[in-house]
């Protein structure tokens, strides 16, 4: 499981050090793709396979299903950590997420997310200010 929040920097080649706590969980490699809210999602290969199977079974007749499948699958790339524990984030994904030098890695259980540091700060402030409303809506779902 991936949990925690970590600040990292991208180097000039677009590489980012994976938090030490997460490296062993990635094993031989991982999948990075476009995420929601303009961040990137990083999945273990096993988690990715589970998600991909669900995605390819969505109905092709629904435009929203097709759009979401395209967003997730067409943007995906295999990544493998180098000896220093860094992964290379492809240019098109750095551009999608607006990544500059400073990034935040947020563990969200079955994946981790990579955010531009300023975008994360804004997202977190917005979410924290609405936490009571969010909690109320989740309680309606039994959480």
Predicted features and spans:
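Flexible "stalk/tail and boundary" regions
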Residues: 1-7, 12, 22-79, 83, ...
């Amino acid at each position: 499981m991936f949990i925690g929040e970590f600040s990292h920097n991208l180097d000039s080649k677009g590489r980012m050090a994976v938090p030490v706590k997460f490296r062993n969980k990635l094993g031989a490699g991982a999948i990075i793709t476009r995420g929601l809210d303009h961040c990137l999602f990083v999945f273990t290969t096993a988690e990715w396979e589970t998600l991909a199977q669900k995605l390819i079974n969505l109905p092709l007749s629904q435009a929203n299903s097709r759009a979401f499948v395209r967003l997730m699958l067409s943007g995906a790339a295999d990544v493998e950590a180098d000896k220093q524990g860094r992964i290379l984030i492809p240019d098109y994904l750095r551009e999608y997420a607006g990544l500059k030098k400073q990034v935040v890695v947020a563990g969200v259980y079955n994946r981790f997310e990579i955010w531009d540091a300023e975008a994360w700060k804004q997202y977190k402030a917005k979410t924290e200010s609405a936490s009571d409303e969010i909690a109320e809506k989740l309680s309606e779902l039994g959480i």
